[in-house]
Amino acid sequence: MKLEDIARELGLTELTPKVTGNSEADIERGYASDLLSDVLAHAPAGGVLVTLQVHLNVIAVASHAELAAVIFASDRRPDDEVCGKANAEGVSLFVSPADTFDVVGRLYALGVKGNHA
């Protein structure tokens, strides 16, 4: 499913409108974790990350893991510095009012699978 369709279906708020190309990315896999070493080891390239972490290291990890997007659950919002870094690195950022469990469940219902599905 296209990232822009996921954002629309989940009612996500986009924080990085300057990132181009990702909205058309076909998202097949996702990962949820707040432990960044776990994300580095297991998140699927081209996928989405669902997390509560909102600091700069999330962007570094997302970029290194070649993630298309990060969804911040529970209405958690990074500051402007984090959004600026994401724009520079080409990582799309979104916010959901739903908690992590609900975001992941809705992603799965839309056809986004985990690494072992």
Regions found by a protein language model. Name each.
Residues 1-22:
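N-terminal, charge-rich interaction modules
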Residues 23-24, 33-48, 52-117:
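Feature captures the catalytic cores and cofactor-binding loops of soluble hydro-lyases/lyases
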Residues 30:
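The Walker A/P-loop phosphate-binding site
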